[in-house]
Amino acid sequence: MNAGAYGGEMKDIVESVEVLDFDNYEVKELKNEELDFSYRKSIIQRKNYIVLTIKLKLKKGNKEEIKAVYEDLRERRNSKQPLNFGSAGSTFKRPEGHFASKLIEDAGLKGYHINDAWVSEKHSGFIVNKGNASYKEVMELIEYVQKVVFEKFEVKLETEVRILKD
């Protein structure tokens, strides 16, 4: 995955990744240029890989400036994201020309829920677990949100979270 937020992406700091290839049970090291990074994707999603280690290339900087940037980003994250409930993070990718959370909110789904699986009332781009939501309930909610948004706006919401099936 090529996670990113606030103008940065993992592709900018990953030097290499050690993976286990489940097709042949070999451990491989992949350099940044071999990872084929794109928006929220890398070769990891297309192959049968499990990430074992990541080597990052970080830059030295002024401690106080780094701390100030960290505090600013932490405050922005805390003010916008539903951190008081369990979630897998941002549920949907940003569709071209739109914001997933705005489409979901405009579709009237903010706060919609199936038992304990909820579209967050704080940020509608997140599906949260307000108790004991099951995998089935979360998947039903994701699929319902996708269906309603498509019916209202003809925009297909693609999941940002990686869904593993049996």
Predicted features, each with a name:
Residues 20-140, 147-148, 152, 156-166:
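Phosphate/pyrophosphate- and phosphate-bearing ligand-binding catalytic cores of soluble enzymes
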